[in-house]
Amino acid sequence: MIIALILTAAALLIGLRVRKNINNKPMEQTDTTVIAKRVLNLIILDESGSMRGLERASVDGVNETIQTIKGGYEQFPEQEQLLTFITFSSRGDSDYRTQFNLLPIPKVEEFNYANYFPNGGTPLYDTMGKALTDLEKEATDSDIVLVTIITDGYENASREYDQASIKALISRLDEKNWVFTYIGANQDAILEAGKIGIRNAMNYRSDERGTRDMWKKERKSRQYFMRVARSGVSMDRLKEDYFVDEEDK
């Protein structure tokens, strides 16, 4: 009887220290645990010439992702969701086009096909540098920031930022509540993401079907992320395994 009581007490103590998430993986409740009142979603989408022919799949994917974020907000309105959406290419007049800027998700309207016309090169580093530094000015220490980068080619047109400076910037932001994901085609996305310090990466095939499949997986991953972010996990755990297997979602 005494042994049984001791074992029961020990089990209760362990239960206070470790909690299981929806995948039954232990999540330490430490000082880094965050249940954010606000999530800043930053989506950076390649608009260079190599995206030509994929306009419809890309725009549809953006709009479906907007609906995913809206659905999460409608289910949990106490967690504010804001969206910044940027497209980029070296078109001459403007490399960097802000389609939505920190809009509360209920106010975000459908992205119009007329606002996406691929052309020019791929100034990825300049776009990331400007977008991240601008968003850092708006983010608070209690916010979670989810950065999604989608490109179908290599960096080839930046003038202000290089690989080293972007890696240093991401490394600094990674010490905060920032989560980075990189989705790439026509490259080894995992290798390219690693060069700038991004741990979550996914390859996709740059044709109509591959683009639609990519957006579908991104939305499922985002739904999972939003669900886990509300459960009070540690930030270290939240930064890992964004693109988890389908059966885990």
Residue ranges and their predicted role:
Residues M1-I2:
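N-terminal Sec-pathway targeting helices
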